[in-house]
Amino acid sequence: MDYHGGTYDVIVVGAGHAGCEAALASARIGAKTLVITLNLDMIAFMPCNPSIGGPAKGIVVREIDALGGEMAKNIDKTYIQMRMLNTGKGPAVRALRAQADKVLYQREMKKTLENQENLTLLQGKVERLIVEDGVCKGVITHTGAHYYAKAVVITTGTFLRGEIIIGDIKYSSGPNNQQPSIKLSEHLEELGFELVRFKTGTPPRVNSRTIDYSKTEIQPGDKEPRAFSYETTKYITDQLPCWLTYTTEETHRIIDENLHLSPMYSGMIKGTGPRYCPSIEDKVVRFHDKPRHQIFLEPEGRETEEVYVQGLSTSLPEHIQRKLLETIPGLEKAQLMRAGYAIEYDAIVPTQLWPTLETKLVKNLYTAGQINGTSGYEEAAGQGIMAGINAAHRALGREEIILSRSDAYIGVLIDDLVTKGTNEPYRLLTSRAEYRLLLRHDNADLRLTELGYRIGLISEERYQKFLAKKEAIEREKKRLQTVIIKPTPKVQEVIREAGGSELKDGIRAADLLRRPEMTYEHIRKLAPADEEIAPEVAEQVEIQIKYEGYIQKSLQEVERLKKMENKKIPEDIDYDAIQGLATEARQKLKQVRPLSIAQASRISGVNPADISILLVYLEQGRIARVSNE
């Protein structure tokens, strides 16, 4: 029976990693927010890898924290191991990665949502949207409840018409055998949304007590305290190790002999899988010359014996999975606890979204996470916080917020999705960012905390600490520009020990720091500051001085980009009225409807000649517009 369930500012459908960030951002901004999710016990569930972070992804987690989101704080409370990756490389590619206690992670995030002001949690299944005259007004659940709102955010993950596949077995299911969402998917098609079919997979889990760890290599966490959140002060010290082993030629032989049983190769799986997280079958076929592949054994938590066999993602039949495990050193007698599987699901074509993550087809409707064609918890959470901010701002009559490609990896992610689209589950990589020297792990707060404070997601106390840090960085940089280090015996000894050439004359401390072999610690010994310099301040001072030339070059490129971003294109421009555009360019421009010349220039199929024609047309001022029928 239909009934009125309530009225809110914002409704969030789904409480995975995107939904949690969207709901918390919306509620913290001051919007009365409702979260409807299929199962309250599965909030922030990790159906695949029990980890947060990694290259590019770890920087997204820092950006979420700098804006005032929750993922960083939650993993800092619940990790079992933390490691900084790429420490031997430059600062642009360093990233933090944490193994999560997946059950504790869920529990802590649920507690955070339950205790959040302005936020209501509800278990239920949304089957339809309330859409009137192209505007989303609310949602309808399977019990007939009508909930009304000024904005709705859909964050349904891999649940839309989800199907699990193991060998020749295929059945309707969400991840980890949860119930799927079928009617909502059908309803989105009814509304006119173009959907695509994607696929992802997960490896088997085995019982830790049955692993022979003596045949594997230990992978401990970092001894140095690390954290994702800028606010974390307590660190977990009793970390659990992960373990490294490898597939063997026997593993590969079994896979080759049973490829006909793999749903990927039998034709049972139609969806496109993630390029950068291939199944073991895919790896063996594509890299046939490799004698072995890495397998990481990752504990799923402190209170469980389940171990995630990372690198062995597969949808081969269960009995073949058991045979594969027997060929891997350390896993010969491992007990299978959960079989690996593939899951196919619906996603919307993301070029149907504006950069705010509002849909072009239905006003006041936003989407975030894997429904937009991405893979990964971090990519989902990054979209979630932006969709939550923009939905709340729409409900409260405030300005929309769009992060540019030079602001954040989140900006790169969203721009790639809405401008270029994706024909496979999209994964964020450092190589996707043109300005990666500016978008570092260490400076996410300097890039985004000002914005988080202006929006209302950063507290006054945190903002004042941030300002104090900024001032300390500038003070110390200024000091190092003026202090002269003379070639005394002590100075020459420190430089020699660092592997550098001795000084002939006095040198400014900043210039000495620019030498590749010198660190801030060396400078601290030779020219100590009068005040205590915090490690995070010292880190910024060293990076900003050492890489100043490269950073300035990147900033000049950003300025050029901003000029193109400032050349706006009306949403309703009639591209059919512009003479001279190539047919493909006209089609792509009509589909994406870019909001600036910069965005238009990034669309595949739009070449520089088309951009020149578009610029001339805009500058002449008489712009034809499409009618809003």
Swiss-Prot record:
GO terms for cellular component: cytosol. SMART domains: GIDA_assoc_3. Its cofactor is FAD. GO terms for biological process: tRNA methylation; tRNA wobble uridine modification. Disulfide bonds: none annotated. InterPro entries: FAD/NAD-bd_sf, GIDA_C_N, MnmG, MnmG-rel, MnmG-rel_CS, MnmG_C, MnmG_C_subdom, MnmG_C_subdom_sf. NAD(+) binds at residues 273-287. Coiled coil: none annotated. FAD binds at residues 14-19, 126, 181, 370. Keywords: Cytoplasm, FAD, Flavoprotein, NAD, tRNA processing. NAD-binding protein involved in the addition of a carboxymethylaminomethyl (cmnm) group at the wobble position (U34) of certain tRNAs, forming tRNA-cmnm(5)s(2)U34. This is tRNA uridine 5-carboxymethylaminomethyl modification enzyme MnmG. It comes from Geobacillus kaustophilus (strain HTA426).
